[in-house]
């Protein structure tokens, strides 16, 4: 499913291709690209839930906004988000790429993925997808994009 999301993000969303694609055509394109129907369905459902945030149909968990409070992760969250992922989320909060609400949206979308393996690079892409879909997060999205591509470009040298 995550591969389908990555393909969609890179092919349709991130490249600013026509976003209003017929769902049947999209499903056919994904099938032609070699993706499994169940993965396609799950990825589209995942994106629908993400779009609910954008449209105001879903709200992230309401949290105390005390700056001295600290997020305690559940065992399920710790299982999916290792220490490096949790540290990266904290880092993004500290540099104000994420706020309390967007952090919770990211965690919720990560837990909704049906993938056995999940690492820091995957988390970065989920964060990018969430920020791209939330109105008012354009600057945060741009910062996250710079962080993601700057680090990856440095690895190529």
From Swiss-Prot:
The residues that cross the membrane are none
Q: Which InterPro entries match?
A: Smg
What the record says about family reads: Belongs to the Smg family.
PANTHER family annotated for this entry? PROTEIN SMG (PTHR38692:SF1)
The record, for NCBIfam families, names: PRK03430.1 (NF002897)
HAMAP family to which the protein is assigned, alphabetical: Smg
Provide the protein name: Protein Smg
Q: Lineage from the top down?
A: Bacteria, Pseudomonadati, Pseudomonadota, Gammaproteobacteria, Enterobacterales
């Amino acid at each position: 499913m995550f591969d389908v999301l990555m393909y969609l993000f890179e092919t349709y969303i991130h490249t600013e291709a026509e976003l209003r694609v017929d769902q049947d055509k999209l499903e056919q394109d994904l099938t032609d690209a070699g993706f499994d129907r169940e993965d396609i369905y799950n990825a589209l459902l995942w994106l629908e839930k993400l779009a609910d945030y954008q449209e105001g149909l879903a709200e992230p968990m309401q949290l105390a906004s005390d700056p001295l409070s600290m997020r305690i992760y559940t065992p399920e969250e710790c299982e999916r988000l290792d220490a490096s992922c949790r540290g990266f989320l904290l880092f993004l909060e500290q540099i104000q790429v994420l706020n309390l609400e967007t952090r919770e949206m990211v965690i919720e979308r990560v837990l909704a993925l049906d993938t056995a393996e999940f690492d820091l690079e995957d988390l970065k892409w989920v964060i990018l997808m969430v920020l791209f879909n939330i109105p008012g997060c354009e600057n945060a999205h741009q910062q996250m994009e710079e962080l993601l591509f700057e680090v990856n470009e440095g690895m190529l040298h």
